[in-house]
């Protein structure tokens, strides 16, 4: 059995860092050591920033984005075409599409995809909010930009079925997005091309 070489506070820091996506136990130890070595330049400011984020971050009641205001900056941006909504699975997808800079539209974050095997149904996602937004009127196009997975395609078809009879054009990203690919990992050029080549469902 390995002996403990640090105090419980450092062990707790490592354990929490290891829960961050992309960081395993080894990477978490390296990150923790780096933060500790740069205590004044990194650890202190990071601690303060995390405290502020914990106190101030909100989920937008309109679109599901994360921001420090509700409704969020995207929803209140008068320079955006609010008649076009890009539907994404997660906030990271919203950020990826914004980095691509191909469209200046509104967004709607579902919070995942339908997955009966995992027990995730329509009521577990932000689908009702989307249907309500479209039902209010003023939306001319809905771009479904979910990942090209079985769950993503199932979700896209479910949303399309729920919006039958409403006067809204429903499109999806073109097949430039690889099957099984996730938007957050695609480069900006691929995302921009996929948005421009979207097709009607």
Curated annotation (Swiss-Prot):
Which PROSITE patterns has this protein been placed in? RECR (PS01300), TOPRIM (PS50880)
Keywords annotated in UniProt = DNA damage, DNA recombination, DNA repair, Metal-binding, Zinc, Zinc-finger
What InterPro entries does this protein map onto?
DNA_Rcmb_RecR (IPR000093), Rcmb_RecR (IPR023627), Rcmb_RecR_Znf (IPR015967), TOPRIM_dom (IPR006171), TOPRIM_RecR (IPR034137)
Tell me which residue ranges form C4-type zinc fingers.
60-75
**Which positions form S-S bridges?**
none
Domain Toprim, chain residue ranges per copy? 83-178
One matching Pfam family is RecR_HhH
Superkingdom, taxonomy of origin: Bacteria
In the record, what terms sit under GO molecular function?
A: DNA binding; zinc ion binding
Q: Which GO terms describe its biological process?
A: DNA recombination; DNA repair
Q: Give the UniProt family note.
A: Belongs to the RecR family.
Biological role: May play a role in DNA repair. It seems to be involved in an RecBC-independent recombinational process of DNA repair. It may act with RecF and RecO.
The molecule here is called: Recombination protein RecR
């Amino acid at each position: 059995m390995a002996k403990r070489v640090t105090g419980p506070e450092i062990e707790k820091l490592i354990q929490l860092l290891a829960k961050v996506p992309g960081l395993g136990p080894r990477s978490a130890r390296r990150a923790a050591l780096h933060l500790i070595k740069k205590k004044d330049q990194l650890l202190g400011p990071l601690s303060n920033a995390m405290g502020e984020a914990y106190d101030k971050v909100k989920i937008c009641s309109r679109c599901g984005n994360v921001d420090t205001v509700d409704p969020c900056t995207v929803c209140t941006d008068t320079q955006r075409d609010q008649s076009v909504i890009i539907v994404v699975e997660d906030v990271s997808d919203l950020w990826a599409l914004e980095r691509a800079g191909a469209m200046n539209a509104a967004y709607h974050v579902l919070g995942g995809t339908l997955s009966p095997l995992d027990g995730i149904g329509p009521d577990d996602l932000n689908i009702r909010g989307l249907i309500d937004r479209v039902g209010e009127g003023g939306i001319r196009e809905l771009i479904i930009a979910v990942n090209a997975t079985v769950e993503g395609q199932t979700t896209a078809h479910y949303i399309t079925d729920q919006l039958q009879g409403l006067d809204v054009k429903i499109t999806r990203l073109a097949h430039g997005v690889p099957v099984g690919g996730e938007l957050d990992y695609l480069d900006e050029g691929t995302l921009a091309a996929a948005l421009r080549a979207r097709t009607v469902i």
